[in-house]
Structures are given as structure tokens and as C-alpha cells.
């Protein structure tokens, strides 16, 4: 008997070669994180303890930043052109990335990080939310166009006799190089200081579907090419946090589903094996009304079906800055968000159990058909195997 056990133990490394497995069933869950500043509601006697009761991942005592998730809003001192009165812009740290002090920014970023995420062993979601400018030159359109204008002005002053085309090339080159250094070194420092966290920038990878620049569900070829060229950043990213914020006007349920799928297809294409946690908001971003139950279900179910590792429900401070708003959100949690998450978890669990039962049945069939092979494995003498 002892010899048989010894031979079996010696043969255990060979079992996967014959399609055999000793793994136990895994826990099947699609985590949904609560990233809403509902701590502001505590002063009204509303502690939002029901969040965890519904199965959402919530920080201890409803802290906005805690052991599960921590978002850093505009941390450090990224260069930026801050809006001021009269349509003016105030330059912060050089205004544009090619003119900023990286040393100053990283020093301040480290201070902010150590204060906001004090636990060096933090292993949750770590999101850097910086939206003043985009690293790809051509993507700074609309309200972000001042970054291109100011960059051109800088080059005109540096090279007063250059043609406009030469100024454009130089401005583009220096801007994108500076943006690359700031974003990449910030991410690397975050990973160095909190190495167990899942680090990424909010909104990336971009898609811009169903916008004036691309009124289709799929991301444009140009944007996909931009994302491919951002390998320098994505190779350091340990989690992706694309935005799935919905709008109400000029959209309908099916179109919103296509919007979600288009963004997720690009995120999954870029991410490969890196986990994706899309950000969803419980309000439409154009009218600020609560989204329908159907839209909430789609915002959670479609990411799960696409292979995302979870989702993040976000909320703004202005959503919970009064007692009335807090009560409204708590009702919405119990009527829409909570049931949607609960149903999703039950569905995910059923699918997981079903898949596991299929695996077990397949293994039983394999056992019956290949009992002779198993017996042959157990009949081997441990001395037949050389190290």
C-alpha cells in the first residue's frame, strides 16, 4: 500500500499530461466595486451599509479610498492649463508637458500617494484620474485644443523663422515626448511604491465611438492605431479602466448596448491578458438622471460576457451633497443597482457551476474510457523515472 501511494505521488506531475486534474472548484464571481463618495451621506444618518449586503466590493466603513479601491484625482502636479475667469488659462507647472518639471511632479505625486494610500501592501484597484490633456497630439480637440495652440506658440517663439509646417512637426514631437515621460514615470512610481496594486489610468484605452468624430459603434482605425502606438504606456499598465458612461439624448437602449460593446472590444483588444475593469456611472452624463434598470443591467452583464474581471460603479460628489440626493441614491441602490448586481452574481455562479459540472462529466467519461491508461500510470515503478 505504501508503495502504491509513493508511486502515485511520484506520478502526480504526469497527470496533466494525460488530461487528469486534481483541482478543486473555484469561486465564481464578477466583482463590482463601489467608487462613490457616500461617506458624505453619513452625516445624514445614511451609512450605505447595504452596498456590501448586495454583494458589491466596498471599502471598510464606506471610506472613499480603502482596501478595495482607491482613485487618485489629478495627483502630483501634472502640467496643465487651468481655466480662469474671462476665458484665460493659468499655467500650472509649465502648462504643457514638454515645459513642466517632472521632478517636482513626481515628488508631489509620491506625497499624495503615501497620504491617500498609506498601506504599502495595498492590493486593490489603483486608478490615476488625469484628464487635462491626452498624450496623443491629435486627440487634444475641443476643450483640449489650447494645449496644441500653446505648444505651437512655444515653438514659434523658439524658432521665429520656421515655416508653419516645421513648427507643427516640432510642437507635436516635443509635446508627445513630454506627455510620454510624465504619464509613464508617474505610473512606474506608483507601481514601485504600491507594487501589489492594480495600476492604470482612467479612461484608457480611448475609443471615441458615437461622437462627432466617429458616429459608429466601433472605434475608428485611427484611434486603434493610436492605441497600438501607446504600447509604451500599456506595457506598464497592470489594469485597464475604460469609461462606459452613457448619454440619454439621441440614443436608445440598443444603441447604448452597441456603444458599450464597441468600447469593450477595443479595451479587450489592447489589454490582451491584463485585467479590465470598466467604469460605469449610474447617471446619464448629459441629463444627470438615473439610468434605467435595463441600462444598468447591460453595463454590468456585457463587460462580464466580454471577459472583463470586474466593473466599477462611480459617482460624483455632487450626487451626494445633500440629504435628498443621498436618500434618492440609497433608494436607487436598493431598487436598481443592488438587484442588478445580485442577479449578475447568481447568473455568474450558475454558469461557473454548470461549466464545472461539464468538466467533471468529461473527466468521468475520460476515466471510464481510459481506466486502462490510469492503471498503467499507477503500475509504473518510481525507479523508472530519472531526475
Q: What would you call each of these model-derived segments?
A:
Residues 167-226, 271-285:
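Aromatic-lined carbohydrate-recognition surfaces of secreted/lumenal glycan-active proteins
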Residues 89-96, 140-176:
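A solvent-exposed, charged loop/short amphipathic helix patch at secondary-structure junctions
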Residues 55-57, 112, 218-231, 260-267, ...:
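Alpha-helical scaffolding within the catalytic cores
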Amino acid at each position: 500500500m505504501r508503495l502504491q501511494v509513493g508511486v502515485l505521488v511520484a506520478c502526480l506531475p504526469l497527470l496533466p499530461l494525460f488530461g487528469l486534474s486534481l483541482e478543486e472548484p473555484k469561486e465564481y464571481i464578477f466583482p463590482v466595486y463601489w467608487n462613490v463618495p457616500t461617506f458624505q451621506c453619513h452625516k445624514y444618518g445614511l451609512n450605505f451599509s447595504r452596498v456590501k449586503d448586495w454583494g458589491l466590493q466596498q471599502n471598510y466603513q464606506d471610506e472613499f479610498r480603502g482596501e478595495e479601491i482607491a482613485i487618485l484625482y489629478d495627483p502630483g502636479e501634472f502640467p496643465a492649463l487651468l481655466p480662469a475667469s474671462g476665458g484665460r488659462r493659468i499655467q500650472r507647472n509649465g502648462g504643457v508637458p514638454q515645459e513642466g518639471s517632472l521632478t517636482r511632479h513626481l515628488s508631489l505625486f509620491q506625497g499624495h500617494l503615501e497620504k491617500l494610500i498609506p498601506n504599502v501592501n495595498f492590493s486593490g484597484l489603483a486608478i490615476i484620474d488625469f484628464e487635462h490633456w491626452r498624450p496623443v497630439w491629435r486627440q487634444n480637440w475641443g476643450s483640449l485644443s489650447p494645449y496644441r495652440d500653446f505648444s505651437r506658440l512655444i515653438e514659434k517663439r523658439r524658432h521665429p523663422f520656421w515655416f508653419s509646417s516645421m513648427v507643427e512637426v516640432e510642437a507635436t514631437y516635443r509635446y508627445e515626448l513630454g506627455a510620454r515621460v510624465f504619464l509613464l514615470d508617474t505610473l512606474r512610481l506608483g507601481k514601485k511604491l504600491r507594487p501589489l496594486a492594480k495600476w492604470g489610468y482612467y479612461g484608457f484605452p480611448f475609443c471615441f465611438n458615437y461622437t462627432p468624430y466617429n458616429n459608429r459603434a466601433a472605434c475608428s482605425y485611427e484611434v486603434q492605431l493610436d492605441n497600438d502606438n501607446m504600447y509604451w504606456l500599456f506595457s506598464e499598465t497592470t489594469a485597464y479602466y475604460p469609461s462606459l458612461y452613457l448619454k440619454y439624448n439621441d440614443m436608445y437602449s440598443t444603441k447604448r448596448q452597441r456603444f458599450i460593446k464597441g468600447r469593450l472590444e477595443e479595451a479587450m483588444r489592447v489589454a490582451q491578458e491584463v485585467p479590465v475593469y470598466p467604469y460605469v456611472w449610474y447617471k446619464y452624463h448629459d441629463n444627470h438622471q438615473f439610468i434605467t434598470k435595463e441600462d444598468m443591467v447591460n453595463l454590468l452583464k456585457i463587460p462580464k460576457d466580454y471577459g472583463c474581471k470586474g466593473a466599477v460603479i462611480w459617482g460624483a460628489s455632487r450626487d451626494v451633497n445633500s440629504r435628498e440626493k443621498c436618500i434618492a441614491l440609497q433608494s436607487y441602490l436598493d431598487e436598481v443597482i443592488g438587484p442588478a448586481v445580485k442577479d449578475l452574481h447568481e447568473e455568474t455562479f450558475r454558469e461557473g457551476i454548470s461549466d464545472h459540472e461539464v468538466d467533471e462529466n468529461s473527466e468521468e467519461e475520460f476515466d471510464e474510457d481510459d481506466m486502462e491508461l490510469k492503471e498503467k500510470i499507477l503500475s509504473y515503478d518510481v525507479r523508472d523515472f530519472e531526475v
